[in-house]
Amino acid sequence: MKTKVAAIYGKRDVRLRVFELPEITDNELLVSVISDSVCLSTWKAALLGSEHKRVPDDLENHPVITGHECAGVIVEVGKNLTGKYKKGQRFVLQPAMGLPSGYSAGYSYEYFGGNATYMIIPEIAINLGCVLPYHGSYFAAASLAEPMCCIIGAYHANYHTTQYVYEHRMGVKPGGNIALLACAGPMGIGAIDYAINGGIQPSRVVVVDIDDKRLAQVQKLLPVELAASKGIELVYVNTKGMSDPVQMLRALTGDAGFDDIFVYAAVPAVVEMADELLAEDGCLNFFAGPTDKNFKVPFNFYNVHYNSTHVVGTSGGSTDDMKEAIALSATGQLQPSFMVTHIGGLDAVPETVLNLPDIPGGKKLIYNGVTMPLTAIADFAEKGKTDPLFKELARLVEETHGIWNEQAEKYLLAQFGVDIGEAAQ
């Protein structure tokens, strides 16, 4: 099977590649990858090349396919897997394999990654339960289940303690104060959505950022009134220019501090602020992955000793986290499409990945069977003045107030003749 992929050939070297995939073994799957949402972790891998812990050597001869937030359709089933999978079945990939090597789809494999028209899912990924049946029909939601899974996993990874009781209570503190720092970006939107609509029931959620435009957008998507209707106080704060943001933020809790803090940017000042905002037994989750292997900040160990403050770090999520993300999206409790601001085809991947931090907006969603430059949803109407494809896409997203939706996805895929398979039974 001939495939077209975006692959890492070295540091800051991402190219399109067309080649013949080998025949699958009896324990592998050949799949068509319909959609993949671009993760900042992919940019980090492209930036570092083989110096990244998950990226192997010899990229020049064996380039690795980018992308891991993907969903698609099974095209061919290995002989030993016919009782478990079938041709035409839709799937979503859970890429966190937890291997000692750190290897996973989108970083480490020549034939296994989300930015591909076709890829081979290897036996090891299948045995680890990474291929999940997808019962829905909206591939964007399936792709976005992976970033939502990471967000959900972070909430589950936090923990709290009782003095002299040597058991961790996993998850955020019920009825507690949550602070989401540097959290008005695409992943932050998902974190706010889950805090309000994920059923974890904090009493207060404070979202902190320094970008007015981003804060204004997320407030439209997730207004304070929505949170209030669920018994949650939601506060948006821009700390840019504040002389003492710590004092102001602690005042929102009566100076008690925050029980759970999530840091969504690998910026020393943000991590230090999080430390100062912790309540007694407060848990700081360092969600943002730094590219600097020597990333260090001061931390108050007096509070560690006397106030039981503590730190966790999370990367990825479990299969159960993924299933939760899919289920909450299917019921409409979570709206992962809120994160999406740009749509593009496979041809847009190299430039998108290499310039990802400099492209404004939220998640960039790629449809591999589509030829289309990366385009902001907000620009559809203007482009539609001269291009009938964008004219119809603009009309369809207008029905959901500028948010990407399943009808727009189906129209786009139909224009390029993409086979969307059938829902898992």
Swiss-Prot record:
Q: Which InterPro entries match?
A: ADH-like_C, ADH-like_N, GroES-like_sf, NAD(P)-bd_dom_sf, Zn_alcohol_dh
Establish whether keyword Oxidoreductase is in the entry: yes
What is this protein identified as? Uncharacterized protein YggP
Family under the similarity heading: To K.pneumoniae SorE.
Q: Which gene is this protein's source?
A: yggP
Write the record's keywords in alphabetical order, separated by commas. Answer: Oxidoreductase
Q: What's a Pfam family in this record?
A: ADH_zinc_N
Tell me one GO molecular function of this protein: oxidoreductase activity
Entry's Gene3D superfamilies?
Answer: Medium-chain alcohol dehydrogenases, catalytic domain, NAD(P)-binding Rossmann-like Domain
